[in-house]
Amino acid sequence: MDNDRQKALDTVIKNMEKSFGKGAVMKLGDNKGRRVSSVSSGSVTLDNALGVGGYPKGRIIEIYGPESSGKTTVALHAIAEVQKNGGVAAFIDAEHALDPVYAEALGVDIDNLYLSQPDHGEQGLEIAEAFVRSGAVDIVVVDSVAALTPKAEIEGEMGDTHVGLQARLMSQALRKLSGAISKSNTTAIFINQIREKVGVMFGNPETTPGGRALKFYSSVRLEVRRAEQLKQGQEIVGNRTKIKVVKNKVAPPFRVAEVDIMYGQGISKEGEVIDLGVENDIVDKSGAWYSYNGDRMGQGKENVKTYLKENPQVKEEIDRKLREKLGIFDGDVDEKEEDAPQTLFVEE
């Protein structure tokens, strides 16, 4: 570029920085090798599937799936991890269904969790925006998008039709929220439900409420589904749950994490340490017996879970070795060009 054009460009950039603040315009190469900050999901298996050691900060995450599949459980584990590291968490309970006893069992510090149960969708999203813009909250969870009922629908008569009202509400809210979430480095998790499209003969009839905006604005989308029931004798004690990363802007997508969600306890940390330990040759399995460093831990997975609960130092040691081997570290993760693909979007 010749000197005259460069001078003109420098003048324009100076004027823009004067009007809009420093950093309003920059060269893309200035951000080369930047670091993607992340917050652990509370599950080493899911952290590995997400590719950057957890949920990326300053991004929007959508967690969706059928009823009772474990969506809220997954989000509550993330809140517990943030609080464990001294962060601040807020929960927008649009469904008015959060169980504080269960949340506490998952490790959530309920005395320091900011909770809002809004009267209508606009109120819930305004509260979420206020938390984000404060810059003082590390994670905001909205449970759920489907329950963010527009004010006009609540005040109207039963049976009134409000075509596209919720979709317009979400679209407007996300336009306002996305920039603020990025600047404040807040992790925003939106939990969503599943609906069936009427009259679909071919292809997947499932869709998520709230229009397409959330699909576009989300950096990560997780599909949570029950795979099978877990039993002790005849008693059902939990579910084997598949969490599929269907969209990921910060790492390769389509990875799948399988975790055990136990009733009243949440994700079984012992269960995933056993599974990943065997998979990565840290835990030895011979028949039904499991061993670590030559010492037998037990026969059968449930007995080994009990052993690890009684010997937490062994569990922590295996967990640490797993994170080292898989390259999962808390906090900042280097984002190299080859690890950061272009925007990927999957239509359900």
Curated annotation (Swiss-Prot):
GO terms for molecular function: ATP binding; ATP hydrolysis activity; ATP-dependent DNA damage sensor activity; damaged DNA binding; single-stranded DNA binding. Keywords: ATP-binding, Cytoplasm, DNA damage, DNA recombination, DNA repair, DNA-binding, Nucleotide-binding, SOS response. It comes from the Bacteria. Its main location: cytoplasm. The keyword Electron transport does not apply. ATP binds at G65, P66, E67, S68, S69, G70, K71, T72. GO terms for cellular component: cytosol. It is found in: Cytoplasm. GO terms for biological process: DNA recombination; DNA repair; SOS response. Belongs to the RecA family. This is Protein RecA. It comes from Staphylococcus haemolyticus (strain JCSC1435). The gene is recA.
